[in-house]
Structure formats: structure tokens, C-alpha cells
């Protein structure tokens, strides 16, 4: 009986650790997603500002401490590519989050099952 209890305890600890790792991954995913969402909004604002400009307007790009003159068409293309990339990353993060949340639900069920089995073993030992 003691060996079975120890085995259940070990399984429970393993599952709880796995659940905690998944929860950390979910938190990290949310943090990265928040950063990408902010960048997406910033790039959309830049895109709108670039659309307002005349074709002859001077556009400068900040590279380190220096402002470098950039062609308007090139600037628009760069911003569009950046928005596409960020959008793709957001979709990827959403898909990853869905998988993590499903995995989290499965681990929670396993932990609950193991806890119930442990509770069932303990009263039996107390009566004996």
C-alpha cells in the first residue's frame, strides 16, 4: 500500500510540474503576443502617416543615432512587410496558445484524477 501511495505521489508531482511549465509557457506567450500587438499598432500608424505624404516628401529612417534619407516607396514597402510579418507571428502565437491551453486542460484533469486516487488510498490506510 505504501509503495502505491509513493508511486501516486511521484506521478502527481510530475504532472503538477508539467502543468506549471505549461502555465509558464502560456504566460510567456501572452507577454510576447502583447509586444507584437503593440508593434502592430505602431506600424499601422506609421503606414497611415506614410499614405498621407506627397510623393516628393522626404522620409527619414532612424538607424542607430543617425537619420538616413529613405525613398517613400521603399519606406511603405518596409512597413507593409513588417505588418505582414507581425500579423503572421500573431497568428502563430494564437495557434500555439490554443495548443497550450488544450494541453493545460488535459494536465489539470490528470492532476485531479491523481489527487482523487490519492484521497481514495489515504482513508483506506487510515482504517487498516
What positions do the PLM features span?
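Non-transmembrane, heptad-repeat alpha-helical coiled-coil rod segments
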Residues: 96-128
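Short coil/loop "hinge" linkers that interrupt or connect long alpha-helical coiled-coils or helical hairpins
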Residues: 48-75, 125
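Extended, charged amphipathic alpha-helical "stalk" segments
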Residues: 13, 25, 31-38, 67, ...
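Mid-chain, well-packed structural core segment of small domains
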Residues: 65-93
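Short, charge-rich amphipathic alpha-helices with coiled-coil/heptad character
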Residues: 1-27
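Extended, EK/Q-rich alpha-helical coiled-coil segments that serve as long dimerization/scaffolding arms
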Residues: 1-5, 75, 124-128
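Long, charged amphipathic alpha-helices with heptad-repeat/coiled-coil character
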Residues: 26-33, 90-107
Amino acid at each position: 500500500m505504501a509503495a502505491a501511495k509513493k508511486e501516486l505521489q511521484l506521478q502527481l508531482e510530475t504532472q503538477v510540474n508539467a502543468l506549471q511549465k505549461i502555465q509558464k509557457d502560456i504566460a510567456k506567450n501572452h507577454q510576447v503576443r502583447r509586444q507584437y500587438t503593440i508593434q502592430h499598432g505602431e506600424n499601422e500608424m506609421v503606414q497611415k502617416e506614410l499614405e498621407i505624404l506627397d510623393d516628393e516628401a522626404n522620409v527619414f529612417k532612424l538607424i542607430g543615432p543617425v537619420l538616413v534619407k529613405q525613398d517613400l516607396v521603399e519606406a511603405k514597402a518596409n512597413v507593409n512587410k513588417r505588418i505582414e510579418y507581425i500579423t503572421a507571428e500573431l497568428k502563430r502565437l494564437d495557434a500555439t496558445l490554443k495548443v497550450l491551453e488544450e494541453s493545460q486542460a488535459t494536465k489539470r484533469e490528470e492532476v485531479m484524477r491523481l489527487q482523487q486516487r490519492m484521497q481514495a488510498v489515504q482513508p483506506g490506510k487510515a482504517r487498516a
